[in-house]
């Protein structure tokens, strides 16, 4: 026991350095794990239609600099999440203060062309939804083009456009403002991608409850005949 304690609290420089390295590695691994969801289970949701919600974070102002892509797939009143860090292979990470993704976080992450096959089935031929397409759809398109990948055929819906068209008296159309205006339980955060996915999901659930006809029209779903 004495030898064990002596080794544990040893002042040996090499052992101290190794302990420090292991602590740093553990902290890094925990940080990376908090920014990804690589294997999710199905969760219940009050939404009967198919939908793919996605959100992208970029390393910098370049639309092809995707460093994180978050996807929530909804089907049969269930959803599962897929959140990937992506190595954008860029030098500038000027948006780090916004989303808290740093170069070291993506240093060992896969590049987009290796992530895309994992999520492509949830885009091709699907109802694909985001909030503010000028940021997220544009980033997806630019990143696909950068990696010489064809853009999939999909039925795209921008909820930002929906609120702009129907609530033109509102002071703002940012997602956080909409969340407050609708008194949602969830609140979007660039640093917490699941929170943003939750917010958009809650909007869809609310539309299903309060505006089912408009929702079906957006999704291209025909009303059932009585």
Outline where the language-model segments fall:
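Short Asp/Glu-rich motifs
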Residues: 115, 163, 198-199
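Short, structured loop/turn "capping" segments at alpha-beta junctions
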Residues: 151-155, 213-214
């Amino acid at each position: 026991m004495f030898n064990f304690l002596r080794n544990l609290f040893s002042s040996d420089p090499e052992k101290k350095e190794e302990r420090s390295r292991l602590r740093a590695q553990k902290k890094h691994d925990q940080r990376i794990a908090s920014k990804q969801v690589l294997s999710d289970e199905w969760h219940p949701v009050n939404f009967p239609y198919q939908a793919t919600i996605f959100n992208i974070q970029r390393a910098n102002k370049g639309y092809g600099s995707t460093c994180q892509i978050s996807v929530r797939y909804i089907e049969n009143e269930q959803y599962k999440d897929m959140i990937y860090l992506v190595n954008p292979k860029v030098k500038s990470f000027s948006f780090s203060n916004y989303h808290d993704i740093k170069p070291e976080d993506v240093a060992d992450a896969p590049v987009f062309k290796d992530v895309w096959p994992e999520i492509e089935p949830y885009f091709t031929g699907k109802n694909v939804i985001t909030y503010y397409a000028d940021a997220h759809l544009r980033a997806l398109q630019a990143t696909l083009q950068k990696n010489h990948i064809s853009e999939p055929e999909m039925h795209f819906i921008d909820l930002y456009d929906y609120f702009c068209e129907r609530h033109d008296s509102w002071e703002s159309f940012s997602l956080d403002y909409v969340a407050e205006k609708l008194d949602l339980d969830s609140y979007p955060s660039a640093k917490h991608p699941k929170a943003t996915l939750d917010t958009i999901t809650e909007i869809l659930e609310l539309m299903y409850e309060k505006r089912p006809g408009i929702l079906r029209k957006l999704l291209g779903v025909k009303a059932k005949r009585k």
